[in-house]
Every structure is written in C-alpha cells, then in structure tokens.
C-alpha cells in the first residue's frame, strides 16, 4: 500500500478533494434556423456569472490514518452570497426578450456530490429554492446541483441578490472557482 492508495481509499469512503464552481445562472433561448424552407427550432444557452461572489467558511479538519499514512479530511460550513445583474446578459448578443427567464437554472458545480451532508437551498431575490442533484445539461461542468427558478426580475435591470449555506466534506484540499467579477473567499480552519 502506498500513500496514493491510502488517499484514494479515504477519498472513496469520506469524499474527494472538492472544487466549488458557482453559483451561476443558465438561461435557455430558442434559435430558429431555416433549411430548404423548413423552420427548425433548437435551444441555445447563455450563462450569467455573478457580479459579486463572496464565500465565508469554517473548516473543521481531522487526520484519518490508513496503515502508516495520514490523510487530511475536513467538514466545512460555507456561506456563499452576492448578486447577479442583467448587464452581462446584454453583452451576450442574445435578444433579451426571447430568454426563458421563468425556467432559468441556478447551478452549483461540485467535484464530489457525496460530500454534501444536507440538501442545498438558495435564497434568491427573497424566495427560497431547493436544489436537485445533477445539472440537467445546463452546467459549466457535469457534476453538481441545480434549481429551476423564475428570474423575470432580471428583465428589469435590477440587482438579484442571493445567499446559500452549504455543509460539505472533502479530503486533502478545497478549491473555489473565481466566477464573480469580484470574488472574495475567507476561510477559517483548525489546522
């Protein structure tokens, strides 16, 4: 047994190293094409990244032993908040009137879903939405959770505030993808 084997064994039983990407919004819109007089409608996707992404968290770490090897694991409690704005949607060259705001998906990608210890929810514009497992073909990456939400408020050029709390465990490391125009991460840990 090598240290790599010990890390892999702990990762399979506890949870792997985590990379958190999001939240971000996916909006669908129809694309009409004409081919030999026949109209064909397909769906396009546009992704809206947050203007502000702030992550505050507490990591509780421990060391698990496998033979002579030690493997770091953690449990985290994260508060992710910020806001979205329709300004970036305007830059996408997609007609704002055809976007399907009422069936938008808010997405959060995770490396290892087994690390979630409770269902994820988000407060978005004073409404609470529960996430479902999987990305339903709407994510930047394939692993994660999503919620179908009504984002009609984005039509009105308003800021759309969000906040979510996540309890997530992992091993070895935790990473955050800096998707926001402004991204801030502040973690406290006992190691």
List each model region and its residues.
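Soluble non-transmembrane domains of integral membrane proteins
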Residues: 12-13, 26, 34-191
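Alpha-helical transmembrane signal-anchor/signal-peptide segments
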Residues: 1-16
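Solvent-exposed, non-transmembrane helices and loops of integral membrane proteins
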Residues: 16-28
């Amino acid at each position: 047994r090598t240290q790599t084997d010990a890390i892999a064994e702990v990762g399979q039983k506890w949870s792997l190293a985590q990379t958190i990407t999001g939240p971000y919004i996916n909006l669908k819109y129809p694309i009409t094409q004409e081919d030999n007089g026949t109209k064909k409608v397909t769906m396009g996707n546009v992704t809206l990244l947050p203007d502000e992404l702030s992550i505050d968290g507490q990591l509780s770490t421990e060391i698990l032993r496998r033979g002579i090897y030690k493997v770091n694991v953690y449990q985290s409690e994260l508060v992710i908040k910020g806001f979205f704005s329709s300004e970036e949607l305007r830059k996408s060259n997609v007609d704002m009137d055809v976007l399907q705001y009422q069936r938008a998906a808010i997405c959060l990608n995770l490396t290892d879903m087994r690390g979630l210890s409770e269902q994820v929810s988000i407060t978005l514009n004073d409404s609470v939405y529960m996430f479902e497992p999987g990305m339903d073909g709407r994510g930047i990456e394939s692993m994660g959770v999503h919620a179908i939400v009504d984002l009609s408020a984005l039509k009105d050029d308003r800021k759309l505030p969000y906040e979510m709390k996540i309890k997530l465990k992992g091993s070895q490391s935790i990473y955050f993808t800096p998707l926001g125009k402004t991204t801030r991460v502040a973690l406290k840990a006992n190691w």
